[in-house]
């Protein structure tokens, strides 16, 4: 198990990579592309500070919600989001991270509850983070029914994938 300070190490990346592929194999949803999961991280870690690397990774990989919302903001759609890899990533986290005791289902439930309890705050954070892209769909109060629908769809798809993989 690794704590936050150790996550920039090659040792952590390799443990995460093995865990990710192990979960995919155990759930019978492994794909060849999973051999390349987070493959850029150890190389970029040689030239970038970890925080910069982490941000770059999350905005450029199809299994992170940051990628999903950036694509929605830019193109008003995200047809290529990898829900399955997201679920596998969430599931394998509790094998490698000390501060992630929850499995994928518990993590999705927790994140969805945070969203439902603070819907307007959650949407506001998305709008602020991606303000360059979402300006035209926000009303004068800073709200957007469109974003709420997209967030609901995002969680609905995560729950469907949890069920399909067998982690519900």
Feature map (PLM): residue ranges:
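Metal-dependent phosphohydrolase cores
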Residues: 1-168
């Amino acid at each position: 198990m690794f704590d936050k300070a150790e996550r920039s190490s090659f040792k952590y990346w390799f443990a995460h990579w093995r865990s990710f592929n192990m979960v995919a194999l155990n759930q019978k949803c492994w794909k060849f592309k999973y051999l390349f999961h987070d493959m850029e991280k150890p190389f970029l870690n040689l030239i970038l500070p970890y925080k910069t690397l982490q941000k770059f990774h999350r905005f450029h990989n199809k299994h992170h919600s940051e990628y999903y919302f950036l694509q929605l903001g830019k193109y008003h759609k995200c047809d290529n989001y990898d829900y399955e890899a997201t679920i596998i990533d969430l599931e394998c986290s509790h094998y490698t991270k000390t501060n992630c005791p929850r499995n994928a289902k518990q993590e999705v439930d927790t994140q969805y509850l945070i969203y439902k309890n603070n819907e307007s705050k959650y949407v506001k954070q998305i709008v602020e983070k991606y303000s360059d892209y979402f300006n035209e769909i926000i009303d004068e109060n800073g709200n957007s029914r469109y974003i709420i629908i997209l967030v609901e769809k995002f969680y609905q798809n995560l729950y469907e994938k949890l069920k399909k993989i067998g982690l519900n």
